[in-house]
Amino acid sequence: MKKNSLYNTSTISLVQYLFAIAVILVHSGRLTSYEPVHFALKSILGRMAVPFFIVCASFFLKQSLRDSRKMKAYLIKIIKTYLFWSCVYLPYAWLFFSSLNLPAYLFPAGVLIALVYLGMCYQLWYIPAFLLGLLLVNQLVKRLGMLWTGLITLLLYCWGLIETYSAYLDTTSLLKGYQLYSNLFFTARNGLFYTPIFIFMGYYLYDHFHSQNFRVHRWQKLAVAFGFLCIEGVVIFQHEGMDKNFFFLLPFVTVYLVNACLRTSFLKTYDLQYLKQMSMALYFSHPIFIEWARYGFSNLPLSYPDRGKLMFVVALLGSHLFGLVMLSYHNWQKERKNRSSNKEGL
């Protein structure tokens, strides 16, 4: 993410870093026995992380749509990153597959499904879902325009809302239809139903960044949208559904949050690019430390909340240590490249 005098990318990097920590919190399991706090942390705060990542990425990608070279370079970079981490988590995928007691000859098919759909580990679903959503939204925008793309992505997102509101839809044909779907495809949190609306929101924000809707009263609009999201959370908390990946107000809260971060003067003069890189290190590496802690502490006589807190601390420290090593390596590579360039210049 390059510095731009128009956009506050420093605050974006900071919030991405904080949301990466929120993802670790979600994957660490239960941190408290008090249900309302557990729900707020895991189902509201934690669920805002990936949408924020998607809206930010698509906002900055929108300007590259007409530059095929930039888009190609971005896609190659993200695919290389995804394939690298898929190889890292291949042993984890094998252990998970083995726990299902399925024949070994089905493992290649399982790897293929994981690679193109579910992810080799529970945080990697985001990349194939983002890429599929990007392809879908780009084709819709190209063929139908932004208005129809917005309506279609919203309708697709509403299909996923069925899992969140399933307790209110008991015995309805909608729920029966969704159950048939989930038996085949496991989840609607994918590149067809989940990511397109957030990609569209990023595109929409880029196109209308200078409109009055996003310029005026931005923090007030964010506060109102977040307040309604909390009310929606209370409704869902009363009767929790099959899963809680989809909140109706989440796309609107996310786009107003990204807009507010891009416009604020807070930290704008600081270079916090390293926090963006650190957030990527945390996001991709934290399951390694969570699973080590889960195995290492399995025999300790701890309650679920205490075990969750311990795993969170271990994963937080371990992934930060990995991030520092990664940043040091990248800086060393950059300095080495600069020295080589200077020698060639001489």
Question: What are the functions of these language-model segments?
Answer:
Residues 1-346:
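Alpha-helical transmembrane segments and their immediate juxtamembrane cytosolic regions
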